[in-house]
């Protein structure tokens, strides 16, 4: 076997492994009875509040806590067998949009929900049996952009069933009218974001390789920046990219090293969109994912999985300075009084 073929097989195997592990957390696919933090968080526009999901016996409720940690407040608790996940704030901080997830006959579903940040009043924005996975506000707060999958299946005998045939949709919040703005039926889409000027969408996609894509709202033209950095996995993974509030940087997670068992260790990397140069900014020696920017300071919240590649994740939330010199764990008290 030639060296080139060995490299191709190694890279292909690595990407398949990543997709298998990624599918474990996608769409609230958590072990039955799981209790603990969800993977994603949202920071309010005034940088005062962190909203997150917390699972009780497999069902996720939404909580809010000061960004420095402390006692959490229950925002929304779903009915049994349902989870509230992937929250996002409106630009003025008055509203929170999130995904309501559930399963029927092993088929997952996801619908859009909107809630008043202060009142807690919530309403469904979509109905039926859709497969919506992520949602973000437009910069003016008048629209939502969301990812919707067309099928839930496996395209390989060794892969788990998961959402495929993705496209991006837009909802006008004044009329509730929805339009599909891409026609890709993509194998994978995630990490949806809107540039500050509202002229482009950013998302992560996987077809033949992992890519961060910027798509023009005017003509659907796409650009795909390739970060310049030393990656330990032979080929970039570019997991969970997050766009900075000024639109000038992207933080993403990628393989930095391996542990003694050969498991990939994912750290946070910062890419400058002017020159695509990237540098590692975390050193947890764990699995770092889902970075979220503060709006008015050079800080991030990242999620660290202490049990990556195991049956159950053990997520913690950490505050990290943008230059990577400081990091601090958020200690949160869930209303039952137990600090986790």
What are these model-derived regions, one by one?
Residues 2-340:
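Sequence signature of WD/YWTD-type beta-propeller architectures
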């Amino acid at each position: 076997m030639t060296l080139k073929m060995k490299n191709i097989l190694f890279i292909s195997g690595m990407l398949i492994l990543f997709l298998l592990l990624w599918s474990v957390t996608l769409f609230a696919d958590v072990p039955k009875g799981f209790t603990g933090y969800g993977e994603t968080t949202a920071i309010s526009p005034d940088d005062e509040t962190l909203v997150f999901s917390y699972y009780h016996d497999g069902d996720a409720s939404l909580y809010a806590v000061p960004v420095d940690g402390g006692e959490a407040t229950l925002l929304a608790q779903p009915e049994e067998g349902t989870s509230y996940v992937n929250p996002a704030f409106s630009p003025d901080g008055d509203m929170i949009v999130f995904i309501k997830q559930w399963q029927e006959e092993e088929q997952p579903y996801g619908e859009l929900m909107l809630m008043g940040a202060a009142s807690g009043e919530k309403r469904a924005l979509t109905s039926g049996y859709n497969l919506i996975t992520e949602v973000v506000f437009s910069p003016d707060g008048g629209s939502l952009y969301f990812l919707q999958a067309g099928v839930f299946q496996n395209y390989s005998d060794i892969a788990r069933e998961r959402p495929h045939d993705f496209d991006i949709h837009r909802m006008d919040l004044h009329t509730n009218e929805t339009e599909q703005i891409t026609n890709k039926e993509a194998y994978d889409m995630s990490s949806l974001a809107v540039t500050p000027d509202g002229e482009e969408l950013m998302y992560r996609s996987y077809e033949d390789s992992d890519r961060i894509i910027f798509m023009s709202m005017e003509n659907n033209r796409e650009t795909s920046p390739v970060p310049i950095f030393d990656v330990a996995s032979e080929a970039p993974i570019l997991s969970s990219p997050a766009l900075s509030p000024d639109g000038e940087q992207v933080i993403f997670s990628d393989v930095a090293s391996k542990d003694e068992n050969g498991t990939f260790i994912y750290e946070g990397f910062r890419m400058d969109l002017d020159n695509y140069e990237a540098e590692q900014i975390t050193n947890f020696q764990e699995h770092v994912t889902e970075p979220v920017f503060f709006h008015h300071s050079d800080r991030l919240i990242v999620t660290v999985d202490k049990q990556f590649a195991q049956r159950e994740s053990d997520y913690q939330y950490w505050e990290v300075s943008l230059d990577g010199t400081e990091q601090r764990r958020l200690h949160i008290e869930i209303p039952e009084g137990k600090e986790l």
